């Protein structure tokens, strides 16, 4: 099977002046009238089965290998290395100003809550020395927490870089599997019904490009910046939200105009009807 010529062409390769749905109908009628149709159907089934199995295996490799590389390198290589450097060199607690602001706000809330609990009688009235000692203990706890967060961010950068390298290596040295996987994905997407295509298009656009998507992008950007220990600059986040979804919307509309409108015009019509 591995030496079979994969004659199953992707949907992109079948685009032309005649819509793909009409050409597939005529191809189906011609095959049903052909005397050797049964052998061809069995051969196509074997090729399709090989394509599906190979694509799923390759997809699992693309997911599992980078994840395993990330976790193993973080636990066994980068984790101990960063912890050693962090403890020996007494590195700074904070990597950026955003961490400082969150730490100071956390300490301030603790102090205010302490005074509030004493005022309402939830805690007995404490002396100034005891209050300062509790605040000091909380400050040390917060300092340790953010030192761990800073070290973890450095580990994330190194481990994620190793994951990206392993992912690119899989794509670089698995070109045949990648081409089979691309063909499988194209056939799967363009094999959906027009209603299903329109549904997923609307779901994608409303989720990533819709009027409510900026809130999701804001949360996502804050999480990504914090993951890598980068400053959570509000101006940068708002600039990203103002430009990236627009660029994504432009690419998506171009895809509809350039490919989907020729491959499946009925799906485009269904999409417009459902979107109205």
From Swiss-Prot:
What this protein catalyses is: K(+)(in) + H(+)(out) = K(+)(out) + H(+)(in)
Recorded topology in the membrane: Multi-pass membrane protein
The Swiss-Prot or TrEMBL record annotates one GO molecular function as: antiporter activity
| UniProt keyword terms in alphabetical order | Antiport, Chloroplast, Hydrogen ion transport, Ion transport, Membrane, Plastid, Plastid inner membrane, Potassium, Potassium transport, Transmembrane, Transmembrane helix, Transport
- Write out the GO cellular component annotations: chloroplast inner membrane
Task: Check the record and name the HAMAP family matching this protein.
Answer: CemA_PxcA
- Primary role: Contributes to K(+)/H(+) antiport activity by supporting proton efflux to control proton extrusion and homeostasis in chloroplasts in a light-dependent manner to modulate photosynthesis. Prevents excessive induction of non-photochemical quenching (NPQ) under continuous-light conditions. Indirectly promotes efficient inorganic carbon uptake into chloroplasts.
Family of the protein in this entry: Belongs to the CemA family.
| Name of the molecule in the record | Potassium/proton antiporter CemA
Native species of this protein? Answer: Cyanidioschyzon merolae (strain NIES-3377 / 10D)
